[in-house]
Amino acid sequence: MSHPDYRMNLRPLGTPRGVSAVAGPHDIGASPGDKKSKNRSTRGKKKSIFETYMSKEDVSEGLKRGTLIQGVLRINPKKFHEAFIPSPDGDRDIFIDGVVARNRALNGDLVVVKLLPEEHWKVVKPESNDKETEAAYESDIPEELCGHHLPQQSLKSYNDSPDVIVEAQFDGSDSEDGHGITQNVLVDGVKKLSVCVSEKGREDGDAPVTKDETTCISQDTRALSEKSLQRSAKVVYILEKKHSRAATGFLKLLADKNSELFRKYALFSPSDHRVPRIYVPLKDCPQDFVARPKDYANTLFICRIVDWKEDCNFALGQLAKSLGQAGEIEPETEGILTEYGVDFSDFSSEVLECLPQGLPWTIPPEEFSKRRDLRKDCIFTIDPSTARDLDDALSCKPLADGNFKVGVHIADVSYFVPEGSDLDKVAAERATSVYLVQKVVPMLPRLLCEELCSLNPMSDKLTFSVIWTLTPEGKILDEWFGRTIIRSCTKLSYEHAQSMIESPTEKIPAKELPPISPEHSSEEVHQAVLNLHGIAKQLRQQRFVDGALRLDQLKLAFTLDHETGLPQGCHIYEYRESNKLVEEFMLLANMAVAHKIHRAFPEQALLRRHPPPQTRMLSDLVEFCDQMGLPVDFSSAGALNKSLTQTFGDDKYSLARKEVLTNMCSRPMQMALYFCSGLLQDPAQFRHYALNVPLYTHFTSPIRRFADVLVHRLLAAALGYRERLDMAPDTLQKQADHCNDRRMASKRVQELSTSLFFAVLVKESGPLESEAMVMGILKQAFDVLVLRYGVQKRIYCNALALRSHHFQKVGKKPELTLVWEPEDMEQEPAQQVITIFSLVEVVLQAESTALKYSAILKRPGTQGHLGPEKEEEESDGEPEDSSTS
């Protein structure tokens, strides 16, 4: 599905309604000030800059014959002239060099490419790092791999759902740091890991980078090893424009005031350098922009690309909206949402009419005859203390034989979302709720999210349940699926559940607990939590024995000022036993439902698969670990997990090194994907790599994920509650693809929201000090993981008070020797050696440019207290959807 045009009704600035700003002048293909354009011959058509796209028929035939290749385009955020698509065989990505070869495709588009002749392939020098490939990857690691959620101030996150925890991803592109690195040099073949990168000075800032690390082939290709060549291609067709064609950025006047273009157009410069510069009609711009352009130098605008012709070097756009001042949270947030195609408009009256109208709503009497009545059972929710959309509840009843009746009860959202209704259509299009640090953009109207569907305590609710008979060791003796009615007896927070786990024999004072319904006691709830915890520990242990993988990464939680909304502080979120308890049972329910719907509908089940790591990147990581002397086994997910959990000690240095290696291990990981079982022939492709299970799906978060709503419908059909789902396998696959796209966009938006708030925090509360560990060494800089805040930064030697610095290799390991200028004449210059995994102390400080901050290495001998102690208050978020899962 392509992006909806729900925001196109934003009125272009200065343009009356009904006046189109799409049509452009005949000379718009000329660069500003291009004098030749004024004297262009009129005898023929203007020369094209871009190739004409191939016909659909030729593309289809070429894909069938294998002469063309399709893939999702990734543009390097650090070097916008470099782009890639994945190689179908998992080998090195296919390289697309330059804007012309990209042929007007934008980041994220599904494109078709044609390989260039071999003499035009990219030559990767033996010392080349290939880090550009890595940098082009963006947010495609599944949440199932990570147990840490991305906590919010007061919201239960889409990625915080307890069944998604394992999937949290890592963005290896260091997107905050846009400095042009002109040369990447590998130390003895260690690729993609920033071990050693030769860079030309930072003085050029964002100046265009050179490409001296690679060249086109100018010699007999037979003399080159296969490893030194990277296949290169050009885009010949765009199968699907997945990029929103919207961007935030700044308005500028064209350079040549005497040109014809100057009198008609302004230049829009996107903040994201992967988006081309755009000509904008002056009639779209503020009326006084030409006379007072400096007044708008710091104003953020939204612009939409409306056309990009073959003979135009820049796209033509329409200015949609003025957002406000750059660097302020709300304008920046709206820009992020718009760029990633998030529909944040109010729900239409047609959608709202689909909701129950007579409020307060009560369960119709006939539902009691169709469902199992569990209202007398001790059922409760465990969520962040401020969560409002409670879509999962748990129960645990001891049996006389020593076993337990354990239930996972999920809000029956599908009851309130009629298939084919306007509500269903908008939910399918949005596909996911989008969670920002300060707010949520819901998939469904709040009446459903927070009231009718939310499993609020002491209120009758419609649910879909999975109930097992389990031994204390977690062995499944019996399993039941069905529609139910529950009445949650209390709303526990993770803190409440954690205190119960930590005090198994002590009674928790009533004043420290939330209200509990009179039918149940705090002791009963406490014992149920302890029983669930005991079983969850056994389930978890067995999962890892069976070969599951977990890559826990540092995640930030913010404390916000209630009046201003600005961040007051932040801390690394601690993922505790109460989080793990919920995660295990959500995983168990998702796996159980996956098997149930696949047995019932082997050709129509909506499942979730996780492909194994990318072969090329994984082999590079293996090589890196070997050279660094790290005994890490990458032969399987379970082997890797065992290496990460058993290789490192518990001292500060070992824990920091584990964090760095976890980041590196995340990079080769691929995205977990929804898919229709009938369209994959090989059942081996159904597998979930991180969980190491044959079948998996998402069932436990229907309030915030449309995929779960579809799975609920499939489960209902499998149980005979309704007719079979009226969706052909290819239609279901299209919806699955759309859910994948929107899920990725949502995760990227969440990351950018976190980055935005952290940048504001550095500006408002900085400088911030922290210990950091070196991840990679370059000739004139090095990369660090800032341990207190979980961010990665590059530290440049020429930004430090150094007398000199020297790069060298010791064996196969790179190192930088820094010679510091003495602070007074009587001191000798201090020498500091930087190696991979060095622990250093850094200062994060704001730069003059909005939302930019840099990392500065502290001078040796000045290390002291590293800033404020970690805040003790727990995150308001929930684990990252163990649904990886």
Curated annotation (Swiss-Prot):
Record's subunit section: Interacts with XRN1.
Record-given protein name: DIS3-like exonuclease 2
A GO term, aspect molecular function: poly(U) RNA binding
EC number per UniProt: 3.1.13.-
Species, as recorded: Homo sapiens (Human)
Region feature (Disordered): 1-45, 860-885
Keyword Cell division: yes
Entry binding sites for Mg(2+): 383, 392
GO-annotated biological processes: cell division; miRNA catabolic process; mitotic cell cycle; mitotic sister chromatid separation; mRNA catabolic process; negative regulation of cell population proliferation; nuclear-transcribed mRNA catabolic process; polyuridylation-dependent mRNA catabolic process
Localisation: Cytoplasm; Cytoplasm, P-body
Disease implication from the record: Perlman syndrome: An autosomal recessive congenital overgrowth syndrome. Affected children are large at birth, are hypotonic, and show organomegaly, characteristic facial dysmorphisms (inverted V-shaped upper lip, prominent forehead, deep-set eyes, broad and flat nasal bridge, and low-set ears), renal anomalies (nephromegaly and hydronephrosis), frequent neurodevelopmental delay, and high neonatal mortality. Perlman syndrome is associated with a high risk of Wilms tumor.
Modified residues (Phosphoserine): 31, 173, 875
Gene label: DIS3L2
Lineage: Eukaryota, Metazoa, Chordata, Craniata, Vertebrata
Biased composition (Acidic residues): 870-885
Keywords, ordered alphabetically: Acetylation, Cell cycle, Cell division, Cytoplasm, Disease variant, Exonuclease, Hydrolase, Magnesium, Metal-binding, Mitosis, Nuclease, Phosphoprotein, RNA-binding, Tumor suppressor
Function, as annotated: 3'-5'-exoribonuclease that specifically recognizes RNAs polyuridylated at their 3' end and mediates their degradation. Component of an exosome-independent RNA degradation pathway that mediates degradation of both mRNAs and miRNAs that have been polyuridylated by a terminal uridylyltransferase, such as ZCCHC11/TUT4. Mediates degradation of cytoplasmic mRNAs that have been deadenylated and subsequently uridylated at their 3'. Mediates degradation of uridylated pre-let-7 miRNAs, contributing to the maintenance of embryonic stem (ES) cells.
Cofactors, names only: Mg(2+); Mn(2+)
UniProt similarity note: Belongs to the RNR ribonuclease family. DIS3L2 subfamily.
GO cellular component: cytoplasm; P-body
First-listed, main subcellular location of the protein, grouped into a coarse class: cytoplasm
Post-translational modification N6-acetyllysine, affected residues: 252
Residues the UniProt record annotates as site (Important for catalytic activity): 391
Domain topic, free-text comment: Specifically recognizes and binds polyuridylated RNAs via 3 RNA-binding regions (named U-zone 1, U-zone 2 and U-zone 3) that form an open funnel on one face of the catalytic domain, allowing RNA to navigate a path to the active site.
